[in-house]
Swiss-Prot record:
PANTHER family: 28S RRNA (CYTOSINE(4447)-C(5))-METHYLTRANSFERASE-RELATED, NOP2 YEAST -RELATED NOL1/NOP2/FMU SUN DOMAIN-CONTAINING. Belongs to the class I-like SAM-binding methyltransferase superfamily. RsmB/NOP family. NCBIfam families: nop2p (TIGR00446), PRK11933.1 (NF008898). Its EC number is 2.1.1.178. GO terms for molecular function: RNA binding; rRNA (cytosine-C5-)-methyltransferase activity. It is an enzyme of class 2 (transferase). GO terms for biological process: rRNA base methylation. Keywords: Cytoplasm, Methyltransferase, RNA-binding, rRNA processing, S-adenosyl-L-methionine, Transferase. This is Ribosomal RNA small subunit methyltransferase F. The active site is at residue 248.
Length: 480
């Protein structure tokens, strides 16, 4: 077991890396890169704010932002106040204006959208914690439909929280082993991202002990699962569709060999789409097949692998599943009921377009993306779209996730809070503004972004921020 500073790099692992690394890269540089702290990076959420507006907004903070070459919304970030104020406690993060995302993990989604077209139906097979799902949603501009699947039950809640914070309403969440989708949803998706579970050899800069229990045998076992996952994903992909396969590991068995296995299995139905032109400088990580094999010393980021494939023809379907999905517990609202909901929502500043449809379950009113409808009855969804409201005393109790997703920036009915008042809001406390709004139900904003819906009670604004989101400790204190 070799120890390099605080980083554990087993000798057998280094042997595998020597074999996997192209001739133009040096092992000494690889080891040195593994010992350097990982640079922090963020991605601007363009569903909330444009990149230019974000840069102008944070300019007074003194943040040093270096563009990520493969993601126009991505930046490496250096901050003088990093020790005093966690990045996740800044106002911009709390309101969903950016996502903390490792730079190399922005690569798979960049590859998925490399042709400039916007797919209508997308699946993210292993979605938690949500960095890539939220990146996909932003590039789709909240249109179409994304099936975001996560096998780990404990991570589904985090996935939903991140989707909600970013104001996304075109996602349906599922909780399955990713190997079910080829049979359950054959040829249903225009684009699929399989960021596969892997041995994590590329994340050692984030976790110095990530490789302490590494073994070649575990790589082979994981690769066997990856082949089953990529086969299932390929069956779920429509002819003409794009499949991006990625990992945060570096050995060939889980990367090139997994893709080659798929190419050999369906030689007449799949082709490689080279990533040579994905961004200036991509050639430094390009393999002879057209994949990107990113060793950490190339771009000073985590290790990663990305392959982009096109399905050129249908393949023989897998046996149809025998399970029963169960009755769908929602019914679409009738026209008159829908009109009443739309009118009431507009009075408080919530609006949406015709790509979202109103559905009801008991006293809950939901908004589902139109593109979700064909999937009803085919698999069970944990949740879809956004919960808009609950019917309450012949009126509506608007839900936090709906306000964050639908109110938009610069809402004319929004009530702008001061920095101190916004901090109180995030701490779950009522706000006592100097001037009181006219409306009883009011969207409170900060930096012109919706924070939630408050109810006026006398001269105070009653806080409705969800208890599970309440923040303690130091919150944003940067100039505004």
């Amino acid at each position: 077991m070799a120890q390099f500073g605080s980083v554990c790099l087993p000798e057998a692992f280094l042997d595998v890396m020597r074999e996997a690394m192209p001739a133009g890269l040096a092992m000494d540089d690889f080891i040195a890169a593994c010992q350097r702290p990982l640079r922090r990076s963020i991605r601007v959420n363009t569903l909330k704010i444009s990149v230019d507006a974000f840069l102008a907004q944070v300019a007074p903070y003194g943040w040093q932002l270096t563009p990520v070459p493969w993601c126009p919304e991505g930046f490496w970030i250096e901050r003088d106040d990093e020790d005093a104020l966690p990045l996740g406690s800044t106002a911009e993060h709390l309101s969903g204006q950016f996502y903390i995302q490792e730079a190399s993990s922005m690569l798979p989604v960049a590859a998925l959208f490399a042709d400039g077209n916007t797919p209508a139906r997308v699946m993210d097979v292993a979605a938690a914690p949500g960095s890539k799902t939220t990146q996909i949603a932003a590039l789709m501009q909240n249109q179409g439909f994304i099936l975001a699947n996560e096998y780990s039950a404990s991570r589904v809640k985090v996935l939903h929280a991140n989707i909600s914070r970013c104001g996304i309403h075109n996602v349906g969440l599922t909780h399955f082993d990713g190997r079910v989708f080829g049979a359950a949803l054959p040829e249903q998706f225009d684009a699929i991202l399989l960021d596969a579970p892997c041995s994590g050899e590329g994340v050692v800069r984030k976790d110095p002990d990530a490789l302490r229990n590494w073994s070649p045998q575990s790589d082979q076992e994981i690769a066997a699962t990856q082949r089953e996952l990529i086969d299932s994903a390929f069956h779920a992909l429509a002819p003409g569709g794009t499949l991006v396969y990625s990992t945060c590991t570096l050995n060939r068995e889980e990367n090139q060999e997994t893709v080659r296995w798929l190419l050999a299995r369906y030689p007449q139905a799949v082709e490689v789409l080279s990533l040579e032109a994905l961004f200036p400088g991509a050639d430094a990580a390009l393999t002879e097949e057209g994949f990107l094999h990113v060793f950490p010393q190339i771009y000073d980021c985590e290790g990663f692998f990305v392959a982009r494939l096109r399905k050129t023809a249908s393949v023989e379907p897998l046996p149809a599943p025998t399970y029963k999905v169960g009755a769908f517990p929602f019914t679409p609202l009738k026209t008159r009921e829908a009109q009443a909901v739309i009118a009431a929502a507009r009075k408080v500043g919530l609006e949406w377009d015709e790509t979202l449809e109103l559905w009801q379950r008991d006293k809950e009113i939901w908004l589902f993306p139109q593109a979700f409808t064909p999937f009803i009855g085919k698999v069970r969804f944990s949740r879809t779209g956004i919960r808009l409201a609950e019917i309450h005393n012949k009126g509506y109790r608007w839900q936090h996730e709906a306000v964050v997703a639908l109110a938009g920036s610069d809402n004319p009915l929004g009530f702008e809070l001061s920095a101190e008042e916004a901090q109180e809001w995030y701490r779950g406390r009522d706000v006592w503004p100097q001037t009181v709004p006219d409306a009883d139900d009011v969207i409170v904003t900060f930096q012109h972004q919706p924070l939630g819906l408050a109810k006026k009670v006398g001269s105070r604004l009653k806080n409705s921020y969800p208890r599970e989101l309440v923040r303690d400790g130091v919150l944003f204190s940067a100039p505004v």
